Amino acid sequence: MAVAAWIGGAVSLLALYFLKEGITDGGVLYGINRSIHHVDMNIVVIPGAIGSLLTGLLYSLFSHWGFFKHNWLTFKWIVTLTAILFGTFFLGPWETAMMEISGKIGIASLTDSAYLYNQQMNLMFGTLQVLVLIITLFVSILKPWKSKKQA
C-alpha cells in the first residue's frame, strides 16, 4: 500500500504539472505549485516513500528474505534509498523553489529563468524517478534474479 501511495502520488504530481498549460493568472499558478508541494510533502509522496522504506526494513528484519540475500532485494534497497535521497536533496528543493518563486512574482514565473530551470529539472527527473519506481515494483513482483551464491 505504501508503494502505491508513493508511485501514485508521484504520477499525480506529474499530472498536476500539465494544469499549468495556458494559465494567465499568477494566483492559479501559485495554487497549482502549492498543491504539488502539499501532495508531495504532506499527504502522499513522502509518507508513501517512508512507508515503503519502513515496510522493506520490517520485511528484511523479520522474514526469510533478509536484506541482501537476493539480487532483486539488493536492487530494491539501492533504488529505494537512492530515490528517497534524490527526492530529498533535488526534487523537493526544485519543487519548493517553484512554489516560492510563483508566490512572489506570480505569472512572471513563466518567463523567470530560475523558475523554468527548477520546473524543467523537476519534470524531467521526476518522470525518470516514476519510471524507475515502476520498474522496481515489477522487480518486486517478478523477483527476476536468483539468490546470491552462498560462500
Stretch-by-stretch model annotation:
Residues 1-151:
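Polytopic transmembrane helical bundles with strong interfacial aromatic enrichment
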